[in-house]
Amino acid sequence: MIARARENAEKLKLNNVEFRLGDIEDMPVTANKANVIVSNCVLNLVPNKHKVFSEIYRVLKPGGHFSISDIVLEGELPSKWKEVAELYAGCVSGAIQKTEYLGIIEEAGFKNMALQKDKTVSIPDEILASYLTPEEIAEYKKGTVRIASITVYAEKPAKDDRNCCEPGSGCC
């Protein structure tokens, strides 16, 4: 994938992009280096999402931003349904609740967060029928559980005030 990305950048005559192979929880990039980070349906597969968003924060320059598309849940997905969703969406195995996902982003220190897309991932009846009983299908269709594809935008503040305190407050 890295070779292909480099080929595409060369074809487009882009000289201000860089592609690196590395561990998303320990990126091979110095702090405050990247202007933009883009990810598509990857972070939900990483067990330690706090570490990933902390690492994204570290790598982004002050004022930099990310745009991340991922799969999240609303409501508890029974394990049997999770198996079905994996067959269809492929990205559901590590999905967490949407509120938890967005909370992790806020905890990492990001600001100006915006949900740019929030689309329900629907599973066709023929796939559901292969794995679920008619009763389970009816329960799923009640809408108590939702698998969603979201795209989130957020910025690293130009000034990092996560660990700052008011002058003279004695907190430091």
Q: What is the role of each PLM region?
A:
Residues A5-R6:
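Conserved SAM-binding loop
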Residues L12-D26:
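Conserved SAM-binding strand-loop segment of SAM-dependent methyltransferases
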Residues E25-V36:
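A short acidic, Gly/Pro-enriched loop at the edge of an enzyme's catalytic core
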Residues V38-V42, I68:
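A short beta-strand submotif of the Rossmann-like class I SAM-dependent methyltransferase core
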Residues N44-L45, C91:
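A short His-aromatic
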Residues H50-H65:
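A short glycine-rich, Lys/Arg-flanked "PGG" loop and its adjoining helix->strand segment in the class I
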Residues V72-V92, G103:
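Short, glycine-/aromatic-enriched active-site segment of Class I SAM-dependent methyltransferases
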Residues I104-C172:
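C-terminal lobe and adjacent flexible extensions of AdoMet/dcAdoMet transferase-like proteins
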